[in-house]
Amino acid sequence: MNEEMSGESPENNKHVKKPTMPEKIDYVFKVVVIGDSAVGKTQLLSRFTHNEFCYDSKSTIGVEFQTRTITLRGKLVKAQIWDTAGQERYRAVTSAYYRGALGAMVVYDITKRLSFDHVARWVEELRAHADDSAVIMLVGNKADLSVGKRAVPTEDAVEFAETQRLFFSEVSALSGGNVDEAFFRLLEEIFSRVVVSRKAMESDGGATVKLDGSRIDVISGSDLETSNIKEQASCSC
């Protein structure tokens, strides 16, 4: 009597791919993005984390974050990018928002002078609440509108950044221009500063600098590679 067997033969089974385990995240970098309302902070996050731009984006309410995973010397690093509302009524979340941040982007709109004039206040608040070693980058968004609509000359921003010892970049969340470069530069500098501090403490016989309990390896710019985005692309408009 013939019997029907369910499943596949052992010969066929050996060709079936087994489910892969999720890759282990080695490090987590918290980066905060601050600036006036409507300068494009949320759009910068969407462009960097999902390569998206939402035309009907609404103002952020409270605090939210998005992530993107990158590879540094074979280690997986999750960049956790925090976004907050620029309105004054949400400033009560300040302390918790800045806690643990290794880097920050202070964003202004190059077509709105007032948003740039407020940058000094944002930097002051950041330095009052964040760690002294946090890496800060001044970011002029909406560079795609520079012809005919620019209200903040690049020279003004460069001068302010130099005076305040900030990194500087002009980007376009709409076109994606220079967005990845700005974030990667910030993340590389975070690594550099943490490593330098760690080595200095070790040479003095002190405790090592730790990031989420993990060892930090020295990297060069060529070691920074983008990995596949681990999260599903979704517009958070």
Swiss-Prot record:
Keywords: Endosome, Golgi apparatus, GTP-binding, Lipoprotein, Membrane, Methylation, Nucleotide-binding, Prenylation, Protein transport, Transport. It is found in: Endosome membrane; Golgi apparatus, trans-Golgi network membrane. Its main location: membrane. It is a lipid-anchor. Pfam families: Ras. SMART domains: RAB (SM00175), RAN (SM00176), RAS (SM00173), RHO (SM00174). The keyword Ribosomal protein does not apply. GO terms for cellular component: cell plate; endosome; endosome membrane; extracellular region; Golgi apparatus; nucleus. GTP binds at residues 35-42, 83-87, 141-144, 172-173. Intracellular vesicle trafficking and protein transport. This is Ras-related protein RABA3. It comes from Arabidopsis thaliana (Mouse-ear cress). The gene is RABA3.
